Amino acid sequence: MSWLSRLNPRGPGTRTGRHAAPSSPCTADPETCLMVFENHWRQVSGVLKQRESSVGGFADDLTAVRNHTDQMLCLLAEERPAGGDIDSPAMGPILEMVVAENILEELVQWHVCRGLDPDSQLELLKLFEMLIGQSHQPLLLHSAVLQPLLSLLGACVDPQMGCPPALESSLVLLLNQVCVSMAKETAVLELLFRCGSVQQGPTNLLIFSLLVPFIHRDGALGQQARDALLLVMATSASNHAVARHITENSYFCPVLATGLSGLYSSLPRKIEVRGDDWHALRREDWIGVSSLVLFMNSLEFCNAVVQVAHPLVRCQLLDYLHNGFLVPVMGPALHKSSVDEMIASTAYLDLFLRCITETSLLKTFLRFILLHHHDNDTILDTLLTRISSNSRLCMVSLSLFKTLLSLNCEDLMLQLVLRYLLPCTHVMLSQRRAVRETDLYGKSADKFLSLIPECCRITSAPSGERDEEPAFWGKVLGSPTSESPVHPRPSTPSRLALFIRQQSSGGQANPSSSGSENAPSSPRGSVSSPLSPDSPMHQLSDFSEGETGYLEYLRDARKGIELCSWGCRDWSAPYDGENPSPNSAPLPPPPPTSNPSLSMVQEHFSVMDPTQQRAAVVAAARAEWSSSDRDSGEWDVTISKNCISLTPRSKKRSLLPSSIPLQSSSSASVSTEITGASETVYQHSRSTPHPALYNGMGQVEFTDSVDERMEAKKVKRDSDVNSGMVETGMNGSMGPVDYNDFHVGSTLKSSQVQLKPHLQHHTSVPSSTQECLPTESHRLSPVLGLTESSAASRGSESVERLIEELLERAPSEPLSGDSKCQGISIEAFHQELRELEERVRERRVSSRSSEESSRESRTAPLPSLTDEDCLPVETEQRSSETKPDSSTTGVFSPARPLGQPLAQPYTGPFITVLFSKLENMMQNSLYVNILLTGVVFQLACYPQPLLRSFLLNANMVFQPSVKSLIQVLGTVKNRIEVFAAAHEDFPAMLRKARRFLVARGKLDWSDSAMGVPSLRRSDSLIKSRKPSLGDLILRHTNSPTRARHAAQLALAHVRDGGQSLHSALFRGSAASGASGLEKQAEALRVKNAVYCAVIFSEFLKELAALAQEHAVALPFPPSQGTEE
């Protein structure tokens, strides 16, 4: 039979491996193949009929049956259809014989009756896998093939023990082939469902049930099982009966969700990295950690199932993921007490959100973040607290928020920012129309660029400095093209290729080169770096680091705005100050008084007792300020439970006219540290000799004198004005103090009473309304709550002492700082405070119903008063708003639960924390500032006029208690200039910092011999390399070789971790006579300040570019079908 060798050239007793390629098409005619098949079957059937009389020789019979069966199934697999229609071809003659005589059923039953040993099971599984995988005919459409297959599968899998380990790979491969065949022929699914019900009962779809246990397996086995299940999901997407079976009679969704929980518990609980710029898990970070790879594979499978599955399956899976994984596992993980575990869980959540692509699954994660409460706090509130934490946790949290902002989710943005801006209380009533205005003339951009500190506008380096420059600062090869801009391109990267957020398109920049060596810098001359290697990044420094490629920033801004606008095109409202209407927009709901975590009590601020908290605050303050200039200023952000308290320490000027003279140096700025745990307050540091007043909650429960709780910090004052200026910090602005406006509020918690003295002022007061000044343009405040007698007594003493000290130190003449306040006398002020004291005493004996009415009054919309509203004051509380003196300490709006509607304008905890971090840029590390400015950049890309005008419109007039981004940046500018004036070598340090950042951006970290070692997994995730700031600092792999080599040499000391970043750039800047610890602290402070100057200048140019691009951006039309 020479034809048989041509047909199947295999020796007796041997078989082609299951991974072998299919044999060549049959060279024999169908009739010959059928004759051979019949011959093999006659020999096999003879053995099968003798099975009952046979006593011995079972091994010989088994061998003969295997050999003949092998030949038969190979002939069947290589047979082609006999012809007929393309859609329904006729069966070949061999297949007709198999179906007519039920050959496969007899073979399987003979093996089952003889007893299926593992070897027999394995051989049969391989034979069926070969038959189904290589057949040219749809075999599974015939019950004569499908029924024996199901019988074999049922016999191979023990109901109690499951599949034997030796059979797992063959079983999964066979099931995968069945699912592939099912995907090609959807009718196979119906047959499987019907045959499975008959064979295994109505509660078991055998193919599906056998695959479920392998969902979370690692390696190729698990991947094949997931691929097969995904094919089942896709095929059953339109089959309601199968979908019902999966949801009602299988454990697919529970196994998938709870399996994720089990896999998450095996993830490393600590992420150890050597680089100080690490902030997010990238693929190269986790690809070597088996437990994380396994989890990510399962999560990606969930994402795929949600994408293709039937709606019934999708809904059940999402519900199980929320209630079986996110709530019981991710929730507690995000609230671990260990900082390392918080960092890991936050990084994991960020990674999950970046890997998920399906909208429904993203919604489930966002629902968990926005709505789920853990220990009475939402996950979002918890994550907000992390921004003000230590550097590493802050960086990971900022990275997470950048990921959240990139989702362009309306619900998320409403919760984070828009709900606080919707009532438009942050702008003056007459300015609401300006929310929708477009800045066509670039005034806002000009304002941002004007904030670049003069000390950062370096046009040339001294010759001594140039000699130290490495060779790669030479000009880029080639001459300028005809498209080169008139002014030179920059020599430091755009949005610093240095620091740009997730930009990997380094080669997309305009390749035009720079201009002449001595080209003049632009009017806004500042420094940046180009985005691409062929930009003037490599130019010689003799043309200076003078002017950044502003066009690069414009391109980045346009891209960011377009992506964001596209993502927001189906939002329910434009958020333009009119839709939704500010009058009908719901204010954030008040916290339930029954929830202890939402009431203004000690537990909001700390779990420590007053003594412990004071000790902790003082210790933290001393440790923090030991390495920095105490006069440089900082906001102490304390976020606990649902309250965010920001205690300003700043004494630098904010961005306000400098023509207002300051007070003499004998004045002191007072920063208060309250003893009680609940006494974290927003405080006024006064430039006048008045005691500190709280624009938040002043505590009634004082047990020591006020003087014992104050730390006086002296600052320079000018001596020609005694104007009593007060700086309101994050949500404040500048103006003279109006001592006629003062109100005290209280809230009740058990026997504890807390007062809320507010001292605020407006920018101007019309002289025609001086008599009714206390009521003009003021927001009505909540009435006082009830108190118990003991607490009321303490409250009375506190109020009386506060009033007496205020009266003793108040000026006896009208304030000289404001010509419009000349009609105000100290007698009127005295009288009003006495009336206020009487009202406080009357409220102590009011009934319980008065307390309930006060709560209702807090939730009611608060009217904006006009000039005609100047009537006698009949409310229990009033507030006046003051503009800050730029030399005094900033004060925030009152500490309050997250989401509480306010009597005073409040821009929300997210904006508050971001602005506080921004104002504290001088103390932040380089990488914190990079991530922080990246988040603000992402926020400013949103096209909604409410948000755009709040961040980028420098011409908007906000309420005096609301501090704008321009003011925050102005404060940073002043601090940088003060720092630069105090350090003669600042220009040299600035150039070195820029050079380092450019070199770092150009370095390909995988080039050197100190390559990236593989990740190791012990009990923690160890990343033994210094990453490139997670794509924020670009890797220019196509940079010239000599440039890369020079960069590697410049950073070799950083790569091995032996020296700090500062030691290479700022050697010798610390005081030589200081101790080692003091030198390190001073070096850290100097390093942060110099890098802050570089980041700050580039950030201003980014904001200017955003402001210009918003003016010309066009909205995208809504899509035809809104996504889920």
Swiss-Prot record:
Keywords: Protein transport, Transport. One of its GO terms (biological process) is protein localization to perinuclear region of cytoplasm. Pfam families: DUF5917, KELAA, RAI16-like. Residues 509-532 have a biased composition (Low complexity). It comes from the Eukaryota. InterPro entries: FHIP, FHIP_C, FHIP_KELAA_motif. Component of the FTS/Hook/FHIP complex (FHF complex). The FHF complex may function to promote vesicle trafficking and/or fusion via the homotypic vesicular protein sorting complex (the HOPS complex). FHF complex promotes the distribution of AP-4 complex to the perinuclear area of the cell. This is FHF complex subunit HOOK-interacting protein 1B. The gene is fhip1b.
